[in-house]
């Protein structure tokens, strides 16, 4: 199966609230390639959910084009939009399962609507229950399932009609961290084995870090940053992106930790480490010039097969040597001195 290609070209959405107009989307332009996982992140009111509603045709742009596999869906008739939606799966934060239907019954429902015959429905439901790891839960009702199991049913239902595109709107927000990890692993499996394009809407950078290929950071209806997860994590350009990255990495000392670190001699610097940060070159030069250097806080992780992290280092030595260390790294990476 090939995933859907999505192209936003100058998409703007203005809502008329009566007293004043509210711009929910402001000139959004970006492309999601077939089989890619795009993470869209932003705080409440950034325009994330409106963006999703544009993709499945539930909202119409005020201006701009929205192309799915090269076809502009803006202005399409409702009948044609229904045909488009038949190839789009949707996963919700609150699961949206029918309480009166079993897990199997919930998965079967969209197949019934599509007119699939009974034998094929059963085959497909059994196949999907196995795919999401719930073969023994088909006869259970939602109230008998955990939150993670309910979301697995939701994912299976979204896959029932073999979509080429999956939209996940805050799909893990109601789940605990361990269950969130399991659901994200399942979405990765969906993408890897079925080739489906996935758009993940979230306010959690850890979700982006875990699953996405690309990330679009939204603020006030605009995409303020867009690129690979590694690019945005290692070199965030806007304040909103920097805030999101800091919530995920948590490698910058807080005020209390900084106070403890400053109780010792030496100057402290918090440095972003990436493959081209130049840190090890600068550290070697400082050591050759007689300075001592040690990592006192932080750590390194892996993002999309790249090493990345933040560390706080303490330097002792001549002022000119430490000044040179700082000046060099200001040209290659993000470095901040912790002031006494």
Swiss-Prot record:
Gene3D superfamilies: 3.30.70.260, P-loop containing nucleotide triphosphate hydrolases. SMART domains: AAA. Part of the ABC transporter complex MetNIQ involved in methionine import. Responsible for energy coupling to the transport system. It is an enzyme of class 7 (translocase). Keywords: Amino-acid transport, ATP-binding, Cell membrane, Membrane, Nucleotide-binding, Translocase, Transport. The keyword Ribosomal protein does not apply. It is found in: Cell membrane. ATP binds at residues 42-49. It is a peripheral membrane protein. GO terms for cellular component: plasma membrane. It comes from Corynebacterium diphtheriae (strain ATCC 700971 / NCTC 13129 / Biotype gravis). Residues 6-245 form the ABC transporter domain. The complex is composed of two ATP-binding proteins (MetN), two transmembrane proteins (MetI) and a solute-binding protein (MetQ). GO terms for molecular function: ABC-type D-methionine transporter activity; ATP binding; ATP hydrolysis activity. Belongs to the ABC transporter superfamily. Methionine importer (TC 3.A.1.24) family. SUPFAM superfamilies: ACT-like (SSF55021), P-loop containing nucleoside triphosphate hydrolases (SSF52540). PROSITE patterns: ABC_TRANSPORTER_1, ABC_TRANSPORTER_2, METN. The gene is metN. It holds the Pfam family NIL. Its EC number is 7.4.2.11. InterPro entries: AAA+_ATPase (IPR003593), ABC_transporter-like_ATP-bd (IPR003439), ABC_transporter-like_CS (IPR017871), ACT-like_dom_sf (IPR045865), MetN_ABC (IPR041701), MetN_ABC_transporter-like (IPR050086), NIL_domain (IPR018449), P-loop_NTPase (IPR027417). This is Methionine import ATP-binding protein MetN. The keyword Cell membrane applies. It catalyses: L-methionine(out) + ATP + H2O = L-methionine(in) + ADP + phosphate + H(+); D-methionine(out) + ATP + H2O = D-methionine(in) + ADP + phosphate + H(+).
